């Protein structure tokens, strides 16, 4: 079914992909927090329950973009990208790569074969998701950006617009401008997402495709006659 969606239109265009719960069977931020707890970097008592709470409220569309971004940005505070990279790379190999299924890779490959420009757009920060985009073979990434101190360490805060909800639409519009692409490209795009948090962007594209949704997004898809596919089978 996913390949049919990818080949439905002949002309190349933007193919936008959410990451967590869409191409990835899991949530990068949640898995990162769990990984750091298991590694002894984060305190289980302090972060374990809070991680689950933020994840559950995010899934229900109840957590604010600022709260979501601040909680997970804080897990990286005090170290530089260079200092974090060995642990980050091991995390991607152990916790992320096995959760990217054949159906997700086939969908991305179908759009690539069609000549579409592939963009991964995610609320998760760029530091964690850049190697995941590379793993998927997606060159363009729009992600939440982390603030870096003059010393080169992450401050534990984000900078700019959090790439979540309406922020995803705003960030993509800015990305189109930066890339010299027409603003109308967004209205002609395809976007794949599992999350009710992505409703603003799903409504902004020509071809919204709902992937393994929860009940709220499934109801929206049914009401709007959007296609629903599964990448988990």
How would you name each of these model-derived features?
Residues 29-32, 68-69, 150-157:
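Acidic/polar active-site rim loop that often engages polyanionic ligands
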Residues 33-34, 73, 206:
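Amphipathic alpha-helical segments within well-ordered protein domains
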């Amino acid at each position: 079914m996913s390949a049919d969606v990818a080949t439905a239109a002949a002309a190349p265009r933007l193919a936008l992909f959410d990451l967590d719960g869409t191409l990835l069977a899991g949530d990068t931020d949640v898995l990162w927090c769990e990984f750091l707890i298991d590694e002894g970097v984060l305190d289980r008592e302090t972060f374990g329950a809070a991680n689950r709470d933020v994840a559950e409220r995010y899934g229900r569309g109840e957590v604010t973009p600022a709260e979501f971004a601040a909680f997970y940005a804080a897990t990286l505070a005090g170290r530089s990208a260079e200092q974090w990279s060995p642990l980050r790379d091991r995390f991607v190999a152990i916790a992320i790569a096995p959760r990217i299924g054949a159906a997700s890779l086939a969908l991305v490959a179908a759009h690539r074969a069609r000549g579409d420009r592939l963009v991964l757009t995610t609320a998760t920060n760029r530091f964690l998701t850049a190697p995941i985009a590379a793993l998927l073979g997606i060159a363009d990434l729009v992600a939440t950006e982390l603030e870096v101190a003059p010393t080169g360490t992450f401050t534990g805060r984000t900078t700019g617009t959090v790439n979540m909800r309406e922020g995803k639409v705003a960030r993509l519009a800015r990305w189109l401008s930066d890339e010299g692409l027409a603003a109308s490209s967004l209205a002609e795009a395809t976007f794949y997402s599992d999350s009710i948090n992505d409703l603003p962007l799903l409504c902004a594209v020509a071809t919204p495709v709902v992937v393994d949704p929860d009940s709220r997004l499934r109801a929206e898809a049914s009401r709007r006659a959007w296609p629903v596919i599964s990448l988990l089978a």
